[in-house]
Curated annotation (Swiss-Prot):
GO terms for biological process: signal peptide processing. The gene is sipT. Its main location: membrane. Residues 43-193 are extracellular. Belongs to the peptidase S26 family. This is Signal peptidase I T. One of its GO terms (molecular function) is serine-type endopeptidase activity. Keywords: Cell membrane, Hydrolase, Membrane, Protease, Transmembrane, Transmembrane helix. Coiled coil: none annotated.
């Protein structure tokens, strides 16, 4: 009887050990999977400042799609997250000009390669600027965007450091990814456009 009791105790101990090992494996796999997803696919980012107002607000959190760096391509109008050159600061801006294009603003109208380009995401800001009797963007250019670089601007053109005035043209390897979704605050979840 004692021998049988010892065998049962050993079996129970082995089951517990196996259970702990299985849980340990599951936790390690989950952590590795989360790290891989965050590094290569999606990552949350915090919006700091008002340069993208009214599209994005200070304190909102975005999910950034990093797959555009591996598959797909950046498109004009995409909201992009940019690594700072010398610090851990990230910038959130709208992609305006792509490599090889010529960018110009005249009378608050965007021209790419001499052709007018609509910017529907600016309609609210344009109305506010008109009420104040000021130009939303100000004239500039033409600026030729070289190979491997991008021209970006904030939607809050009167209050944005961007390719016009401080950030300069953005190297492709500084673009982390594109924003597609605001997930916080929860009551303001939405797609970004």
């Amino acid at each position: 009887m004692t021998e049988e009791k010892n065998t049962n105790t050993e079996k129970t101990a082995k089951k517990k050990t196996n259970t702990y090992l299985e849980w340990g494996k599951a936790i390690v796999i989950a952590v590795l999977l989360a790290l891989l997803i965050r590094h290569f696919l999606f990552e949350p980012y915090l919006v700091e400042g008002s340069s993208m107002y009214p599209t994005l607000h200070d304190g909102e959190r975005l999910f950034v799609n990093k797959t555009v760096n591996y598959i797909g391509e950046l498109k004009r109008g995409d909201i992009v997250i940019i690594n700072g050159e010398t610090s851990k600061i990230h910038y959130v801006k709208r992609l305006i000009g792509k490599p090889g294009e010529t960018v110009q603003m005249k009378d608050d109208t965007l021209y790419i390669n001499g052709k007018k380009v609509a910017e529907p995401y600016l309609s609210k800001n344009k109305k506010e600027a008109e009420k104040l009797g000021v130009s939303l963007t100000g004239d500039f250019g033409p600026v030729k965007v070289p190979k491997g670089k991008y021209f970006v601007m904030g939607d809050n053109r009167l209050n944005s450091m961007d390719s016009r005035n401080g950030l300069g043209l953005i190297a492709e390897d500084r673009i982390v990814g594109t924003s597609k979704f605001v997930f916080f605050p929860f009551n303001e979840m939405r797609q970004t456009k």
